[in-house]
Regions:
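Blade/loop signatures of beta-propeller domains
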Residues: 20-30, 58-61
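Beta-propeller domains
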Residues: 56-74
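A short loop-to-beta-strand structural motif that recurs across blades of beta-propeller domains
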Residues: 63-65, 106-109, 151-154, 193-195, ...
Length: 310
């Protein structure tokens, strides 16, 4: 999530504090939207266990929660300080705290699913935000804090505890996704652009999408096997579909923002994951309006995820 202090900056992008219609082209035909759970606070991030269940974070209410296959919502941890990115890895759920431009120093923590035990792995992080599990088991996380010198993207190896504070120095980054080749990742930052970063050359990011093709305040994201990227939009409450080869983009849904008097822009969508939906795949989306939604694609769209563990 981008801290509320970004509201002033958003006003420079949109005519008013209310969400204006995105100028990104629309491609919503054929997509079906349903609700998994609603009314559970400001949802910041999610991940799937691959078996119809999800782990979500609530940034304002400070929780890590579980959503089962029937939609039953249960808080597992409370009292967390601005929890953000979350990833399931075997018997563990990794998550970040301290998300925000001016938040207090944050942490990377590990929750053991079987016992509920929590282990603090890293402290003193500079506004940690997005989290990604790599095929080799390492974790990448983005940082957006401005209270200290920029730290870019960090890398942590759970098997040994090895930590690289600045794996990539690309600043003010947010979402993360693995590319289907397994040799690069995607990320975005406050310049409103999306980048590809080779895993073997983290200081060589290449911008692949942005204004004018994509007008967005990009948040978390996920890629498909065919290298299509789906990106949450924190400004307009959209999910944008991005062609990573050309930079062309379109919105499959918009307007997922807080209603009326509860608005506090930016307050749109925050994360998107591809997860099983019966024998097929669907997008699952969190938003600041407290709803976890399922987006089923048209028949001609293959959502097979890039991430092998899905």
């Amino acid at each position: 999530m981008l801290a509320v202090v970004l509201a002033a900056g958003l006003a420079a992008v949109t005519p008013t504090a209310a969400a204006a219609p995105t100028t990104t082209p629309q491609c919503a035909d054929g997509w079906q939207v349903s609700t998994v759970v609603e009314g559970v606070g400001n949802l910041e991030n999610l991940d799937s266990d691959g078996a119809g269940r999800f782990y979500v974070t609530g940034i304002v209410d400070g929780f890590l929660a579980h959503v089962d296959s029937t939609g039953r919502f249960e808080k597992l941890l409370t009292g967390l300080d601005f929890p953000a990115g979350v990833r399931v890895a075997g018997p563990y759920v990794y998550f970040l705290t301290g998300d925000g431009l001016t938040a207090a120093p944050g942490t990377l923590q590990r929750y053991e699913i079987a016992t509920g035990a929590v282990t603090e792995l890293l402290t003193g992080l500079n506004g940690p935000n997005g989290l990604l599990l790599l095929p080799d088991g390492d974790l990448l996380f983005t940082t957006i804090g401005v209270n200290a010198p920029q730290t870019g993207i960090g890398r942590y190896r759970p098997s040994t505890g090895e930590y690289t504070r600045t794996w990539s120095s690309l600043p003010l980054t947010n979402g993360l996704a693995l590319a289907p080749n397994g040799r690069s990742i995607y990320t975005d930052n406050l310049t409103m652009r999306i980048f590809r970063i080779p895993l073997d050359a983290p200081e060589s990011p290449v911008a692949i999408a942005g204004i004018p093709n994509l007008v967005t305040l990009p948040d978390d994201m996920e890629a498909t096997r065919s290298d299509t990227l789906f990106v949450a939009d924190h400004a307009f409450g959209a999910i944008n579909k991005v062609d990573t080869r050309t930079g062309a983009a379109c919105a499959i849904i918009t307007g997922l923002i807080k209603p009326g008097a509860t608005r506090n822009p930016p307050d749109g969508t925050t994360s998107v994951r591809i997860a099983p939906d019966g024998d097929s795949w669907a997008l699952y989306v969190t938003a600041m309006d407290g709803t976890l939604r399922r987006l089923r694609p048209p028949a001609d769209i293959d959502l097979t995820p890039a991430t092998p563990t899905r």
